[in-house]
Every structure is written in structure tokens, then in C-alpha cells.
């Protein structure tokens, strides 16, 4: 697949529509107004917006926020985003009352100006990829740039439908970075290449395991999904989370991957999952106990493999990360990945939180901004938002 970068285009004097990911977390403050609790996604879009402005573009920004079910909802307005963007961009940001229609047409920016459209999902046509709605969006601009990797797995009007209707389309700088790192990891990674997968369910990551199994030298599995594999090996799992309907699949994956697949060799177990619950470390999960994290022997074994890697792909926690002290395995893995010196690609909210908790964010090569999109990419799926840029 070949696509253009925003850097390949002449933006001077052109209206450039940038599809960004401003799906930020909001909460009501004491005055009842919605405020942003994390502006990470806004800041992630700044390089592309600044590049467009520096090269003489009139910038139109578009995003969804939340799930307003196809109608306006003041609690999911992008107005707080416009205010925050203006602060961090240090350029005035006009806020449109809608994303299409005569009012928006009347507000179209001049070169050097920024207009933020209202939430795309206030129109049901966005998620339906409605051709007429896509045409209205396309009519706003001359150049289309997709910088919303987190929405690239959706075939919506703003990510796919309108792209065919514009004169030129390209990837933004953030999108380009995502595709560079994830593409390298899944096609031609520096070796040894190690993948670490965690999280609760095998069913969420079957395709990822199968696809990465073709590429990686070692695949380390932690989190609750490991217990389905342990059961497939005939080992006791106590009351740990097991997907019984996936045990046969786990058996076939074990046979296929052989010694390349590594599972936990010890476990942190509890009688009940509760804050402050007493725990013990065991090699074999006893009857009636629930495994909630990988144990120290597993941390050591996983860390040793990671230390010798040239590429590390990590997605998903090693235990019940949100309930300390059962976050220790995940934090230890974060430190191992950061200390490896390998090209490291991390995805998934808990893995990202673990990197922060371990204080090693600056030592990770790339933290993916797309949850579902990065998983689908790792699974080898075609992302509609990326395929639409193919030229």
C-alpha cells in the first residue's frame, strides 16, 4: 500500500481538512460545565496542525467525541476541546456550531486560521458512512489529511467516504508514525522480535496471536488470557478466569507456536478479588484460588527474553492492574521493556498506564494512540481509514 504524507503536498493557500482524534475524556466540574481530564490526544495532534499552519494552510479540524447516538448532546460538544486547543496551539481556534451546512460554510477559515467543526457523530450519517454527508464534508476542503489513527478501523464518512471525493488525500504526521512503527513490527522487525500480550480474554486477541505468531521470535502471554492456555496444557487454574470455549483453540496455538510461546511459571493468587485481600505466590494455582498477576519467577523469565530483544511489541496488562498490588507484574514488564534498548511499541490503556507508573514513558519508542485500531493492525486486518489513503 502506498500513501502520501502531508509533507508531500503543497498546502499553501489551500483549505485542509484534518481528521483528528479529539475523543478526550470529559467530566462535569463543580459548576456543571464539562472539562477535559486528559488532553493527551489534543497534544498528539499538534505537530500535524502546526505543520499545516506553517505551510500556509487554512485548517479545518474534525473529530468525534463519545457516542451521542446521531444527535446533538451538549455534554459531548467539542467546545471544551476548542478552548484547550487554543491554549496549547497558541493560535485562535474558531468553533463551528455544526460540522456541515451554511453556518459552517460561512465560517470557513482563511490561510493561517483554524476552524474546529462540532462533533461529527451529532449526525447519524457519520457512522453510517452516508455518501451525501461525506460529500458535504468533502465540499469544505481541497485537501484531506487523516491524523486519527485511533479511528482508522472505522469506515465512517470522515475516515473513508469523503476521502474518495477530495482532490488530494494524505496521512498526517501522527498517522504516519503509527503506520511506520506498527508496519515495521509486523512485516520486517529487527530481530529478535518479542511480543508480550496480556489482558483478560484470548477471544479479544486470537487474530493478533495468530498474525504475530508468523512474525515474532518469542510470544510471551500474561494476564488472565494465560489461564486458558494453562488449562489447555492440563494444568490447574483454580477459580481463575478461563474461557472454556477457547481451550481447544489454545491447544492448537500451543502446538503451532511450540517453544516460541512462553506462559507464566508462577502466579500471585487470592481467595477473593478485593482491595487489601491477602495474597500468596505459587508455582501451581491451588483449588479455590484466583490468579491475579504473574509472579517473580515469571517476571524474571520474561525480563530475560525482553533484554535480548531488538524489537518489542507489548499490548495488555499482566494482571489485575487496576487493583494494586496486583499491578506489580505489569510495572515490572514496563521497566524491562524500557530497559531493553529495543525498538518498543506499546498499545493498550493499561500498558500505557504501567509505563507512566514505572516512570519510563520517555524510554519507549512508540506508544500507540489507537486501541482497537492498533489491535486490528497487529491482527493483520486492513484498516478502512488507511486503505482510503491508498493512491
Curated annotation (Swiss-Prot):
Residue numbers binding substrate: 21-23, 41, 64-67, 121, 154
Which residues constitute the signal peptide according to the record?
none
Q: What is its main location?
A: cytoplasm
What is catalysed by this protein?
A: (2R)-3-phosphoglycerate + ATP = (2R)-3-phospho-glyceroyl phosphate + ADP
According to UniProt, this protein's pathway is: Carbohydrate degradation; glycolysis; pyruvate from D-glyceraldehyde 3-phosphate: step 2/5
Q: Does the record's keyword annotation contain Kinase?
A: yes
Superkingdom is Bacteria
- Which is an annotated GO molecular function term of this record? ATP binding
**E.C. number:** 2.7.2.3
Enzyme class, broadest EC rank: transferase
SUPFAM superfamilies with a match to the protein in the record: Phosphoglycerate kinase
| Keyword terms, alphabetized | ATP-binding, Cytoplasm, Glycolysis, Kinase, Nucleotide-binding, Transferase
A GO cellular component term found in this entry reads: cytosol
Can you state the subunit structure given in the record? Monomer.
Query: Can you name this protein?
Result: Phosphoglycerate kinase
**What lineage does the source organism belong to?**
Bacteria, Pseudomonadati, Acidobacteriota, Terriglobia, Bryobacterales
Amino acid at each position: 500500500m502506498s500513501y502520501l504524507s502531508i509533507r508531500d503536498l503543497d498546502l499553501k493557500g489551500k483549505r485542509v481538512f484534518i481528521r483528528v482524534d479529539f475523543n478526550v475524556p470529559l467530566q462535569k466540574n463543580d459548576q456543571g460545565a464539562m472539562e477535559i481530564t486528559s488532553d493527551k490526544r489534543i497534544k498528539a495532534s499538534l505537530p500535524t496542525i502546526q505543520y499545516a499552519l506553517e505551510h500556509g494552510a487554512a485548517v479545518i479540524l474534525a473529530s468525534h467525541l463519545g457516542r451521542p447516538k446521531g444527535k446533538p448532546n451538549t455534554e459531548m460538544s467539542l467546545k471544551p476541546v476548542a478552548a484547550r486547543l487554543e491554549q496549547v496551539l497558541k493560535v485562535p481556534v474558531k468553533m463551528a456550531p455544526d460540522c456541515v451546512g451554511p453556518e459552517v460554510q460561512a465560517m470557513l477559515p482563511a490561510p493561517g486560521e483554524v476552524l474546529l467543526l462540532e462533533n461529527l457523530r451529532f449526525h447519524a450519517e457519520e457512522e453510517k458512512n452516508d455518501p451525501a454527508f461525506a460529500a458535504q464534508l468533502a465540499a469544505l476542503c481541497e485537501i484531506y489529511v487523516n491524523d486519527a489513527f485511533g479511528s482508522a478501523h472505522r469506515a465512517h464518512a470522515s475516515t473513508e467516504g469523503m476521502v474518495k471525493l477530495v482532490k488530494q488525500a494524505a496521512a498526517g504526521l501522527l498517522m504516519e508514525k503509527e503506520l511506520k512503527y506498527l508496519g515495521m513490527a509486523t512485516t520486517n522487525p529487527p530481530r529478535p522480535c518479542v511480543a508480550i500480550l496480556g489482558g483478560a480474554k484470548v477471544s479479544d486477541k486470537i487474530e493478533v496471536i495468530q498474525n504475530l505468531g508468523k512474525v515474532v521470535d518469542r510470544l510471551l502471554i500474561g494476564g488472565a488470557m494465560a489461564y486458558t492456555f494453562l488449562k489447555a496444557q492440563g494444568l490447574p487454574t483454580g477459580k481463575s478466569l478461563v474461557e472454556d470455549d477457547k481451550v481447544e483453540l489454545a491447544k492448537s496455538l500451543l502446538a503451532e507456536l511450540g517453544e516460541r510461546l512462553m506462559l507464566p511459571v508462577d502466579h500471585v493468587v487470592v481467595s477473593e478479588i478485593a482491595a487489601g485481600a491477602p495474597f500468596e505466590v505459587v508455582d501451581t494455582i491451588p483449588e479455590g484460588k484466583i490468579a491475579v498477576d504473574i509472579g517473580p519467577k515469571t517476571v524474571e523469565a520474561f525480563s530475560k527474553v525482553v533484554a535480548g530483544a531488538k524489537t518489542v511489541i507489548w499490548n495488555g496488562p499482566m494482571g489485575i492492574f487496576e487493583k494494586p498490588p496486583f499491578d506489580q507484574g505489569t510495572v515490572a514488564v514496563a521497566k524491562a521493556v524500557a530497559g531493553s534498548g529495543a525498538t518498543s511499541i506499546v498499545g493498550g490503556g493499561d500498558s500505557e498506564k504501567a509505563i507512566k507508573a514505572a516512570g519510563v514513558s520517555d524510554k519507549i519508542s512508540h506508544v500507540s494512540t489507537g486501541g482497537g485500531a492498533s489491535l486490528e493492525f497487529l491482527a493483520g486486518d486492513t484498516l478502512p481509514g488507511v486503505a482510503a489513503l491508498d493512491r
